[in-house]
Each structure stands twice: as C-alpha cells, then as structure tokens.
C-alpha cells in the first residue's frame, strides 16, 4: 500500500508541475482551457481503468484462461506443485499465493493479483507434462519473483500515468487545433475531435513503448529472482526449453501476455512493443550474472 501511495503522490506532483508550467507559458490563453481541471479529469479516468483491472486481475485471469485453483490436491503432481510454491513463497518472504493449472498445450505460466500477499500463480497443463521438475520449479520461482517484486502493481500504476498524459496532451492538441488554428469559437468542433483522436493514437503508441520497456526490464528481474530461488542452471534450462517450444501456438489471452513467462519473438523496432525480451537475451543475461 505504501508503494501505491508514494507512486500516486509523486505523479500528482508531476501533474501539478505540468499544469503550472503550461499556465506560466500562457498556453491556456490560446485555447481558453482550464488545465488544472483537465489534469484532474484525465488522472481520474487514466488511473481508473488500470486500477480496476488490477483489483479484478485474479478473477479475470481465472475466467479467461479456465484456471482451476488447487484447494485440495487430488494427485501427487498437484501436491508437489503446492509444496513447491509454498517453499518458494516462504523463501521470497511473501504469503502463499493461490496456485492453479490452466488447460493449454503451450508451455506457459503467469502470476497476477493486486497485492503480493494476495496473488495467483498458475501454470499450463502443457508445461507440467513436458518440463522436468527442476524446470517447472524454475518457472514457478520466476513467477514468485514477479509477485515478490510487486510487478503487477507497478505496471498498473505506470499504465495509469501514461494513460493520464496521453489523454491530457491529446486534448491540449485537439483544443489548440480547434481554437488557435481553425479559429473555432463555438465550442469543440470536428477539428477538436479529429485532432484529439489522432494525437491519442500517436501518443498511445509512444506510451506503449514506455510500458513495454518496463515490462521487459521486469522480466530480467524476475529471471534473476528465479535463479536465486531455484538455481541459475535450472532457470537457464527452463528458458532454453521455452525457446525450443516457440513453434507451439500461443493460447494465452492477449490481456495476460505481459504476465506470462513465454514471449519475446521479435527484434528491432517490432521488439519495442514486445512485453518480453527475446529468450536469447534473457539466457545470456543469466549466464553473464553467473560469471
């Protein structure tokens, strides 16, 4: 909770400074817009979506993947899964998350939840069937690393910030085009709406690059946490196994791609919009840290 409060306070200060700067520059005289009120409006709507998504993330993940939470283990594999997650959670200093299995042939796993002490860790049936116990443990350790690092909360807050700024500056641009260029004095016209939508599309792409950059950084941190909890050799072996299965069709819903362990097939400019680094880069980072 302290992380959320500090993050919100910091970004509130940034928003206030941005509003004051625009006022001092006299931008409001060109557009006749109250930027303080606009900032508040954009912040409310910008954060609302990302925070609501965060708080219902466990429910959404279960529904979209068909994850079955293990409350009472029915097989020795489920018993091993629960014991392994409990052991890793204890070592990471977090409460035991819910543990589930989702029906997918692809080898994948994800962690989600609004709080590191109220999370969900789930693995695919395909991963359990084809990976060795050490490799499964490494994947679980990677997901526990995400939970312990508070990555889900941080990603939601960053998304809220970029949402706010995209909405804010898109509306400034739209109003500037409408008032200062098209000289419309009769309230928001077609120029305002067209310019705002255009700006939101362009700024949205730039914002996605920022969010995905953070997402890729957190994957490296989660890999490092997985190596610490399960061993560097096991973590590298798990990533190598994932690399060998990259031809298997992805069944993870798009909304959960950023939270899965698998991903990162593109390089170059396309790689800027990927939630995961290429597996080769992740493996090399682990090898470099072990030297």
UniProtKB/Swiss-Prot annotation:
Active site: 143
Compartment(s): Cell inner membrane
Parts of the chain that traverse the membrane: 4-24, 36-56, 150-170, 193-213
Keyword field contains Phosphoprotein: no
InterPro entries for the chain: HtpX_protease (IPR050083), Pept_M48_protease_HtpX (IPR022919), Peptidase_M48 (IPR001915)
Protein name listed in UniProt: Protease HtpX
Membrane topology label: Multi-pass membrane protein
Gene: htpX
UniProt-listed Enzyme Commission number(s): 3.4.24.-
Source organism (scientific name): Pseudomonas paraeruginosa (strain DSM 24068 / PA7)
